[in-house]
Swiss-Prot record:
It is found in: Nucleus. Keywords: Activator, Nucleus, Transcription, Transcription regulation. It comes from Aspergillus fumigatus (strain ATCC MYA-4609 / CBS 101355 / FGSC A1100 / Af293) (Neosartorya fumigata). PANTHER family: MEDIATOR COMPLEX SUBUNIT, MEDIATOR OF RNA POLYMERASE II TRANSCRIPTION SUBUNIT 14. Disulfide bonds: none annotated. Component of the Mediator complex. Signal peptide: none annotated. Residues 41-62 have a biased composition (Basic and acidic residues). Its main location: nucleus. This is Mediator of RNA polymerase II transcription subunit 14.
Amino acid sequence: MPGVIMDNATTGRPGHAPDTQTPSNGDNLRNGSFHINGAAKGDKDHDPDKESYAGKPRIDGHRALPEIPHITQGFFPFSTLVNRSVQQCWNELSDLITELAAIHVSPHSSVPLLPVNGKSPGNQSPENVQKKLRILDFAHAKRAEFIKLLVLSQWSRRARDVSKLIDLQNFIRARHQAFVDALQRVGEMKRDLVQAQVANPDLQTALEILSKGRLESLADLGYKSSKLLTARGALRRLHKINRIISARLALHDLIPHPFRTYRVHDGRVTFVVRGEFELDLSIGAESELSQFFFVDIRFLYSPSSNIPKGRMSNEIDAKINEKLRDSGLTGCFNFLHGLVLTNKIHILFKQAIELAKGLWSETLRVELLHRTLVIQYWTLKPGPKSWIEIGVKSGNGDADSQGLGVPCLGLRWMRDGQEVNSRDIEFDPEDLSMECLLRSVIALHISYLLSSAYGILSEYSLFSSGTLSSHAILNVTEPGECQLSVQLTGSRHLRVSIEPMSGAVILSATPGLLERFESDASLDRSTIDDLVARVSRLRCIAAIEELESNVRILGFETVSPKGLRNDIRKVFPANVLRFSLFWHPLWERNWVVAATSSITSDNWWVVRLRRSSEVATDFSVSDTSVPLCSGHSMSDTFLATSHQTRSSSFPDLGYCLSGMVAIYANVSYLSDLHSVEFHPPLCALKVESDLQIPDIFIRYQVSNLPRALQLVLPAGLKRKNLLKDTVRLAFHGIDRHKNSAIFVAYGNLVGPWTDLCTLISKSDSSLVFKQGGSGFALRLLAPAGRPVIVQLFKSLQTLECTLSILDFLRQRRLTPQSLSLTHIAFAYGPGRDLSATIEMGLSEVPSSAELDPVRVLARTDPLLCLTLGIRFKHPNPHRRVQGSLAAILNHASNEAGLDFVTEVLSFTLPLMRALEQITSNASRQEPFRLQVIVRNAYTFLLHYTYQGFRFQLTTRQHSGQLTWVLRELSSPEAGPGHDQFKARLRGTLYHSKGNGWKGLGNGVVADAEGVSNVIRALDGCFTGAQHNTWLPRETKSEQDYSTQPAPENQSQTGAPSQAGMANDTKMTANFVNDKSLQRNPVVSNAADVITID
């Protein structure tokens, strides 16, 4: 019994060792010595798993019975289990401690919780509760495991009796198996002895047969020979059989639907299946339950042959009779129908092989896959392949099958790699001809190609208007009669046909015309697209040559396509056969316009050529899927020709094309973004009849912008929809000084705004507000061909942010002074004598590659981030906390932000003015006496270096309102007169009170206005305390407290470290809850004040 736990200390009786235990009953004496978990003394060779011993002679001389084998396999000491459980508990406890240490527990909220039942609830944050639950679950689990160990310990004290029971059970099982094996062997022996038995010879029967030649004991069956059947009798019997068959078929047998056509004659029934076979069956008994028997079969399709006599005929005869016996007429039909279908497929296969070896050599490919015949035609033709498949098709729901659920031969036509309907293919299942089938398929294929080409040509304006004519002759059975005739000019015609066997296109025209354009055509193309391209090219030659001569007069330069590294032909549609490129000196080199001519119309195109450096930077050379140029048709007529008679045609056309290049770049960018609605769409972007450049109307909604283009605002600044959702982007010419296109975005504000025009600086030309209205205009500059959409969205969102800040300042009754897209200046203070500037800094505009629409849509992180800053000029006292206020503006918490900054300015103004007054040293003759370290806007450290005193000034909630608390911090070194200063501080501050402040015994609490009195009183306690050796000490103190963190004991007594100070500010003031207030160090202008943010 594996897994038995033995406790060595308690296996035997109490007080006895296991190996010295003696038997206490007669059984043990009869079986010899009793051993536990081992051999007896003096036994050296024993099995560690099973131990047995031969019997020893007893006193009376007889051998004793053998010892029962003792089982020790699977036993292990109980101490091992205890040790492993303890080790596992220790390991899991270590893992639990590591896991709990990784869970960050948020500190207590600054709002104190009321005690419940006289006990403090403690920290009830989710993280802390989770930690407690994990500890409790671990304790419960380990408690249950050790309870199990206790139960096992109690059970192991009785393990000796269980071990005896195991040994006894093993002995009984061994004896039982021995009895079973003995019975099995006896049975096998008895079975083998049967083969050894030999019957006794029957000598009497053998003697009678040898002597008389017969055996009298055998019975005579009394068979009589039949009479000869006469002609009349045979006819009578045949009529009787006909009646029996007719009655049976009409009343009893289930006839399948294909066997409904039959006739009864000559003692047999003939079933006729049209196009397949005739089957003759007869009966062998009058009973209606007897089976039909096969007589003969004849095939009704050609080519076919009778079944040859011999082995094949016998096998088919036996197989049909078996089907009639087992499945009746239905099983017989299914067997013969499948046999016929398979035979037809093999006949067609042989015919296809003969064709592939004859006239259709190298143009056919034949494969037989099980019962599916595949014939591929036009094998030498490049491109998608075409083939037909002939196989057995299920007849379920098929009207063409011979009956419901009856399979039949089916065709599957794959034309140019795509499956098409095969109902028009001429295929006779009764007269099998693979050549006729192929001719029908190829004729339908050729008819499809020529009719498609005819349809394309008929849609062109030249043919639909009747200027040119075309007609097609089609045939569904004979491919040689299919042809297409096209009128090229008034006197020239072209006839197109396709060779049936190879699929090659044959063009028949006048020799001169054919030689001229066969050289331009590709030899690999064999579809009707070649014909359309060649016919279209004829008309395009004269149109382009005339256009080039007219445009050169207007001053454009012709660009040769061979000098471009880009394949310019890929830009235009396939029907454009002739084109010419032009460039203007005012444009960038990567932009050209193209005049194209096709069989449908003449067009001006704007084409952007990608530079080779762009390709090398963004895309690999081997990537052929990336377009190297792009273009758009912007007119349906040649504008140069229509304006060539005007003297000002060149400036008008140059302005028009320059505007189209600039507008097209922006519309194309909007089209690639997909999420922004605009008008007109890219496909409808056209030059108007008077050469006016169309404007772009954009629906501006921040929620519809891609994630990467949405401006990320600080958490404290709420996004407001202050602009109407329609913005008009217009082209306003070219700035020749900057060689850039000028765009103006016109929009309207949601509500009325006053005095916006007065706040805009006259030197800022990028933003203009309408006088007395809600309209505004943004001026944008970009090189011609570079989109300004990202710049537009950034400016619009920045404008909304600027207006939101302006609206907030007015709600707080602060006085705005100036306004732009980069800053807002305002005045604050009791007399509005102080000014501050909120700066709006945007992240750097990414490169052109990063602003690609595909990359913009794929990005999940924003590209545009707004960072607010605040700037104070000298002598504004708040300049010392400028960095901390800027961090609050950009804090990740929703509680921080502009609202919080305005409160900070109001709350800290008295303090900052008092510190500014004390630390100012205009003459620079008085030595430094006070060092101020600004941790953040709500935490200050005041250090009197000479006297050796350090104070911490922080905010606390006192009597339900935010107050200033001044506490003295321990100093590593005491200065001269330390006790006198200490007594002066107690009398003046700690045990006193004044206007707006009150002593606390070990500190001072003051409101926002009274803190200035506290600072002045504190400074008065140290006024005049100077020392001649203060400079070295100040240098050492400045190094200790300005560049190094406070010691650990000081952090516990009231001088926390930089990170701890930020956390303490968060808990007490409930305004700032992150360490981000400790960034961007800003040093004040006074040399005796150090600011650490």
